[in-house]
């Protein structure tokens, strides 16, 4: 009995660190993009931990019922980056841009809830072919790599001069995380990201790059603010963008469950049920993200790799870790320490994880033979989506809001384009030798 308690405790700690490592970096990156103050970043991190903990618990308890960690979605970050840059160029209040994003999260959440509860999600599965999924992951990695490299150089907001010392430390951490994830053994490989973040923060502190701004009035417990960015705003552009973006969120959930199925056995009859529950629960998670003004959270496919490496497949310790993260989020003094994480270090750690995403993208693309048809679709998709990324945000300034949000997002355009081409240009049916005779 005592051994079981020790094992459960260690398993809970491992899951807690995994949840924390995947939730801690993106709020720092978003804070840099929107030029948020330390207090704003700290409260954003608090709300992110709170939503990640609750969302992961709900998914494991009522949703797909697998130990799959929820975390801030990299795909949502692309939307945040685009609106943040547009607001900066147009001289708009960036808080208004964040209120529009709250509205987008609500729309996406409602659509996901309807798709999951009505079973309509099953009818959309034919759209998410290996070519579409691979293209989505590849474009996602490319689009966010630019944002993360800028963060590593210290180029956030209106800053035009790179911080040389920050860049040197960041690229060292980037290389270290990759090295540890490949060459590290046991727990070292499992926590390469966390080790990199810890060492990078220590180096920044040693070179005087971290300035603590704690106050004596920090309360012991504090519930996260509701609508901290203000009342959600809706316009036609964000509504249409969110409707299209839902396809990406469904694709993410399907990818996560498929990856975990390779680690945790599942009966075929349970697969559809798990998907529908995961989708409508994901809708609730997005509405919670809007309510608490944070980044949309999604099931993380990386959970499968963590489970395979550590052997942590039981749902009990996972649910306990989710509850622990939720409780930690109510303690501002703890969150303030985590908010001191330098943005360049967070960007470096995230960029290292995207190396694996590129590999997964290629694996998905190679699930089917890359014949002339698929190569052409892939080429068109990549050229158009990447070409849009190279255009300056000012190009889209004169467009109506609907077209502005869509056309300026290479990830969204590329994924929808791949879906359309896959359905319009049907693959030729192979005729066997006996059929010819």
Where are these regions (language model features)?
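N-terminal signal-anchor module of multipass membrane proteins
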Residues: 1-67, 78-91
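Membrane-embedded helical hairpins/re-entrant loop segments and their flanking transmembrane helices
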Residues: 31-62, 243-315, 436
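Membrane helical hairpin/interfacial module
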Residues: 56-121
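Membrane-embedded alpha-helical modules
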Residues: 94-210, 322, 327-435
């Amino acid at each position: 009995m005592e051994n079981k308690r020790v094992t459960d405790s260690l398993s809970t700690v491992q899951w807690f660190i995994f949840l924390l490592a995947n939730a801690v970096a993106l709020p720092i990156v978003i804070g840099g993009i929107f030029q948020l103050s330390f207090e704003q970043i700290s409260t954003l991190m608090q709300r992110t931990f709170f939503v990640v903990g609750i969302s992961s618990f709900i998914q494991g308890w009522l949703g797909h019922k697998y130990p799959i960690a929820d975390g801030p979605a990299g795909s949502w970050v692309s939307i945040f980056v685009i609106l943040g840059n547009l607001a900066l160029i147009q001289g708009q209040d960036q808080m208004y841009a964040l209120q529009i994003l709250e509205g987008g999260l609500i729309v996406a959440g409602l659509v996901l809830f309807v798709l999951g509860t009505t079973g309509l999600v099953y009818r959309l599965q034919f759209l998410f072919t290996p070519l579409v999924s691979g293209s989505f992951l590849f474009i996602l990695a490319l689009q966010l790599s630019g944002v993360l490299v800028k963060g590593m150089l210290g180029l956030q907001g209106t800053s035009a001069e790179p911080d040389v010392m920050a860049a040197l430390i960041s690229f060292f951490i980037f290389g270290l995380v990759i090295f540890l994830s490949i060459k590290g053994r046991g727990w070292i490989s499992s926590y390469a990201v966390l080790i990199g973040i810890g060492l990078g923060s220590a180096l920044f502190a040693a070179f005087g790059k971290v300035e603590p701004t704690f106050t004596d009035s920090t309360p012991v417990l504090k519930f996260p603010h509701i609508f901290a960015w203000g009342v959600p705003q809706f316009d036609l552009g964000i509504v249409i963008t969110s409707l299209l973006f839902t396809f990406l969120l469904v694709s993410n959930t399907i990818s996560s469950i498929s990856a975990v199925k390779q680690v945790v056995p599942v009966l075929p009859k349970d697969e559809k049920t798990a998907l529908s529950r995961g989708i409508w629960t994901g809708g609730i998670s997005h509405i919670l993200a809007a309510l608490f003004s944070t980044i949309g959270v999604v099931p993380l496919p990386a959970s499968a790799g963590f489970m395979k490496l550590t052997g942590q497949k039981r749902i009990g310790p996972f649910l306990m870790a989710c509850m622990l993260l939720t409780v930690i989020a109510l303690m501002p003094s703890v969150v303030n320490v985590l908010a001191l994480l330098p943005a360049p270090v967070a960007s470096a750690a995230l960029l290292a994880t995207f190396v694996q995403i590129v590999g997964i993208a290629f694996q998905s693309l190679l699930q089917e033979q890359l014949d002339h048809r698929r190569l052409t679709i892939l080429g068109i998709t990549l050229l158009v989506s990447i070409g849009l990324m190279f255009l300056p945000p000012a190009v889209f300034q004169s467009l109506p809001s609907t077209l502005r949000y869509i056309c300026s997002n290479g990830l969204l355009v590329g994924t929808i384009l791949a879906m359309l081409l896959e359905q319009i240009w049907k693959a030729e049916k192979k005729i066997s030798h006996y059929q010819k005779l």
